[in-house]
Amino acid sequence: MSVVRWPRVLTPSLLSQILKKQKNPVTALKLFEEAKERFPSYGHNGSVYATMIDILGKSNRVLEMKYVIERMKEDSCECKDSVFASVIRTFSRAGRLEDAISLFKSLHEFNCVNWSLSFDTLLQEMVKESELEAACHIFRKYCYGWEVNSRITALNLLMKVLCQVNRSDLASQVFQEMNYQGCYPDRDSYRILMKGFCLEGKLEEATHLLYSMFWRISQKGSGEDIVVYRILLDALCDAGEVDDAIEILGKILRKGLKAPKRCYHHIEAGHWESSSEGIERVKRLLTETLIRGAIPCLDSYSAMATDLFEEGKLVEGEEVLLAMRSKGFEPTPFIYGAKVKALCRAGKLKEAVSVINKEMMQGHCLPTVGVYNVLIKGLCDDGKSMEAVGYLKKMSKQVSCVANEETYQTLVDGLCRDGQFLEASQVMEEMLIKSHFPGVETYHMMIKGLCDMDRRYEAVMWLEEMVSQDMVPESSVWKALAESVCFCAIDVVEILEHLISSKR
């Protein structure tokens, strides 16, 4: 029987709204099927299929998702490339990379004219699973097709993989061949190859690469360029070639940044300490000089700050924030997120909390769900999941900041790891109400934890919820429940009645 009040006239947008409101993905699929029976003149479009596929993918219901994808192919409705990219990620996450490859190879059977995002996503997932040879085969076979209208992301990925296995020589060949592929190296291309050269100690090649930037892509004072320049300068300093680094800095300031002379920092060649502390000091001075030489703009400061924070260079990153504020720019949520992440990695949780509670408020910048998620993960990883729950409550009171699946999943996993199963149960209940679906492992962890706490009725309720979603509990879950029954006078018949009624 239907669980919704159907409208007199059904449209795809109305059905999408109905499906999104369903707590159970199985129920959503039944309504999806029922729609055509109730409304003979109605037809699903690409948007409805995308909604249904997204719901099934997020709940890891791979078989049902494959069924809906097959239906979408039969209906021949227009499909977005982003839908297939999402499905490819879902297949990979479920350990079914072969299904992802098979789907991509069959895209010509769907009404989809652009495969660029799916192509890039598949290659990324194959590289992640160390399927390098197969990824190269896919690249060679499909990179020239008209469906893939941009190859720069795939080529950058190929260069990155080659550099990771210390084959910057091959990555350099890919870089040089880009023009023949109908694309042009971007800053990411230069950054990847520069890092590859420097990691292998090929500083001469890295220097020539930097010079080529001056006339190929560099813009006056661009902070995005500084990210690449700094890789070489740091590598030269680490190799003890500080004098060369200072000389190249001068060329960067004159040709790359075209900075005024007042921005030149007084670092004289030969006047530096050869100790590790001395070299680190020179590196900091070089970075400060680059920051001063950049043309003040939000994009430049953002690129420099996030790059430094990603490398864990908190002091230098903070100097960028001070510089941008002095020029009248305020850090964005993206920059704050990078700073919070760096602080959490460094174990400085108090400072990370202060960024959200104090620094962002003073800068009149409201935290986004992304910033909150970074802090919540940092707190949970440090065993402070109960403190992290407070930020879920804080998000609910903030306008236009809605907790997403990552928020809930991180909190539930963190609370369970800390043995806070009752609190985890409450968060997971809210998670389901918001139509975010935990995975099988989360249910297993929750049920076994509640049994260990002698909270059998709550455990049974989650088992009932699990079974209602057609999930099959593993043997250890049944064992935990059986042991709980044996040690306490709980009615076994009552448990069975719960499970039987949930399947009706």
From Swiss-Prot:
Keyword set, alphabetical order: Repeat
Any one Pfam family match given in the protein's UniProt record, by short name: PPR_2
Superkingdom: Eukaryota
Keyword flag tRNA-binding: no
PPR repeat residue intervals: 45-79, 80-114, 115-145, 151-185, 186-216, 225-259, 260-296, 297-331, 332-367, 368-398, 404-438, 439-473
Membership in a protein family: Belongs to the PPR family. P subfamily.
Name of the protein in its database record: Pentatricopeptide repeat-containing protein At1g05600
Species the sequence originates in: Arabidopsis thaliana
